[in-house]
C-alpha cells in the first residue's frame, strides 16, 4: 500500500500529536514488543474475549495492505483484550484465506488465547513498522466496536495502531484500538516478550 493512500485513510508512520492522548496512553500506543505481555504485566487478571472469527470482507484500506486485487473475503478475527474485567483493546486481524491455511495454521484454533502468544515466540515471524491513526466515530473499526461496546459512542477519538506480520509468503494485518481504560492503567512491562 502506498504511503499516500495510507495517509488518506488516516494511517501515518507516527502517532500525531493530540492533547487528548496523554503521555501514559501515548506510551501504551507507541510501545514496542508484545502488547499482550504489557497488558498482562499491568493487570491482576488478563483475558481474551473472542468476538468474531470467520471469513469476511476486509475494509478498503485493509485489502490493499494484504495485497488482494479486490475485496475478496479474508479470515477476520476480532477480540477484546480485557484487563481486570475492563476492555482495554479492541483487536482486529485480517489474513488472506490461503495464507491462513498455509502460513498461519494456528489462527483458526486460537479461540480465546492471545495472538501475541504465538507471534512473538515464532522466529519465522517478522513485523513491519507500526502505522498509527486517530479513529473518529465514522471509521469502520469504530462502527464495529460500537456494535460490541455501545458505551464507546460518546468518545470522540480513539488512538489505534496497526502492523503487518509476515511469515513465509503470508501477510497478516493486526489492528489494535486503544480503549479509555488505558488512560489510567500504568504502562509497564516494556521489553518483555510473550
Curated annotation (Swiss-Prot):
HAMAP family attached to this UniProt entry: UbiC
Cellular component per GO, a single term: cytosol
Subcellular location, record wording: Cytoplasm
Origin superkingdom: Bacteria
Binding site for substrate: 77, 115, 176
Any GO MF annotation of the entry: chorismate lyase activity
Protein family membership: Belongs to the UbiC family.
Entry's EC annotation: 4.1.3.40
Keywords of the record: Cytoplasm, Lyase, Pyruvate, Ubiquinone biosynthesis
InterPro entries in the cross-refs: Chorismate--pyruvate_lyase (IPR007440), Chorismate_lyase_/UTRA_dom_sf (IPR028978)
Reactions the enzyme catalyzes: chorismate = 4-hydroxybenzoate + pyruvate
Record pathway: Cofactor biosynthesis; ubiquinone biosynthesis
EC class name: lyase
Protein name per its UniProtKB record: Probable chorismate pyruvate-lyase
Amino acid at each position: 500500500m502506498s504511503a499516500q493512500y495510507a495517509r488518506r485513510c488516516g494511517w501515518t508512520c507516527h502517532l500525531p500529536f493530540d492533547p487528548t492522548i496523554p503521555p501514559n496512553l501515548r506510551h501504551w500506543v507507541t510501545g514496542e514488543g508484545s502488547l499482550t505481555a504489557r497488558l498482562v504485566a499491568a493487570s491482576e487478571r488478563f483475558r481474551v474475549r473472542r468476538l468474531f472469527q470467520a471469513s469476511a470482507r476486509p475494509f478498503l484500506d485493509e485489502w490493499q495492505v494484504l495485497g488482494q486485487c479486490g475485496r475478496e473475503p479474508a479470515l477476520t478475527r476480532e477480540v477484546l483484550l480485557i484487563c481486570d474485567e475492563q476492555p482495554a483493546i479492541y483487536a482486529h486481524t485480517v489474513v488472506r484465506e490461503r495464507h491462513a491455511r498455509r502460513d498461519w495454521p494456528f489462527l483458526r484454533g486460537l479461540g480465546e488465547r492471545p495472538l501475541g502468544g504465538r507471534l512473538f515466540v515464532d522466529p519465522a515471524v517478522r513485523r513491519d513498522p507500526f502505522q498509527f491513526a486517530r479513529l473518529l466515530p465514522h471509521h469502520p473499526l469504530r462502527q464495529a466496536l460500537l456494535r460490541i461496546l455501545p458505551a464507546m459512542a460518546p468518545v470522540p477519538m480513539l488512538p489505534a495502531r496497526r502492523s503487518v506480520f509476515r511469515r513465509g509468503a503470508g501477510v497478516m494485518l493486526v489492528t489494535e484500538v486503544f480503549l479509555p481504560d488505558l488512560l489510567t492503567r500504568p504502562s509497564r512491562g516494556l521489553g518483555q516478550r510473550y
